[in-house]
């Protein structure tokens, strides 16, 4: 029903646009909305904050999903229940290729390693996490037109943020396997998108390198211009896809 509200994101079908930009941090929703032509605040419950954005005449939502696969899966499920057709995640990441990708660089991901938990409860572990090609291609096309250099590659989506001593992380192994970046949610999004026939993709800005944390290679106070570049690529991509879906 149009008026039925989803339990956690507190949005109805009537409020949910076909194209949605998702971010982890509710505070980043505020950074996104001020770059739009106009916006309307919609809801804020738990980690799920939502805004209707208007950018270049096109309407789409920006919604925060919090940290980690379980919480973000709730957000994605409820958006899909409400009829979302395209969901793009824009967030921060760590570089697993520190000689190539430095703090402030942008990576558009074509696939992800499923080191989450929730997607394995949805479908077999052999099932791939891949971006929709149209979303991936549009993100890259927009970046090229805006003259913003970007990297492409695979993301490791891991439920582990702080490493522990008993079981070592696999970061070094995935780095050697040429995985580009590490974050926490896009694999879940990609798997859910494929299962639900929803187009998905991911774009990320590097805030450091977890392979070099002991050397102090981390700073989430990202250069505003670099962060704004990632947001502008995301907004333009959402606007273009909103014309079609």
Swiss-Prot record:
Identification of the protein by name: Purine nucleoside phosphorylase
InterPro entries attached to this UniProt entry: Nucleoside_phosphorylase_d, Nucleoside_phosphorylase_sf
UniProtKB keywords: Glycosyltransferase, Purine salvage, Transferase
Family matches, as Gene3D superfamilies: Nucleoside phosphorylase domain (3.40.50.1580)
GO CC terms of this entry: cytosol
Gene Ontology molecular functions: purine-nucleoside phosphorylase activity; uridine phosphorylase activity
GO process terms (BP): inosine catabolic process; purine nucleotide catabolic process; purine ribonucleoside salvage; uridine catabolic process
Function description: As part of the purine salvage pathway, catalyzes the phosphorolytic breakdown of the N-glycosidic bond in the beta-(deoxy)ribonucleoside molecules, with the formation of the corresponding free purine bases and pentose-1-phosphate. Preferentially acts on inosine and guanosine, and to a lesser extent on 2'-deoxyinosine and 2'-deoxyguanosine.
Active-site residues per Swiss-Prot or TrEMBL entry: 207 (proton donor)
Keyword Kinase: no
Residues in the signal sequence: none
PANTHER family, alphabetized: FI09636P-RELATED, URIDINE PHOSPHORYLASE
Biological or metabolic pathway of the protein: Purine metabolism; purine nucleoside salvage
Residue positions binding phosphate: 24-28, 46, 89-92
Organism: Plasmodium vivax (strain Salvador I)
EC number: 2.4.2.1
Family: Belongs to the PNP/MTAP phosphorylase family.
Binding site for a purine D-ribonucleoside: 8, 184-185
Catalyzed reaction equations: inosine + phosphate = alpha-D-ribose 1-phosphate + hypoxanthine; guanosine + phosphate = alpha-D-ribose 1-phosphate + guanine; 2'-deoxyguanosine + phosphate = 2-deoxy-alpha-D-ribose 1-phosphate + guanine; 2'-deoxyinosine + phosphate = 2-deoxy-alpha-D-ribose 1-phosphate + hypoxanthine
Transferase keyword on record: yes
Quaternary organization: Homohexamer; trimer of homodimers.
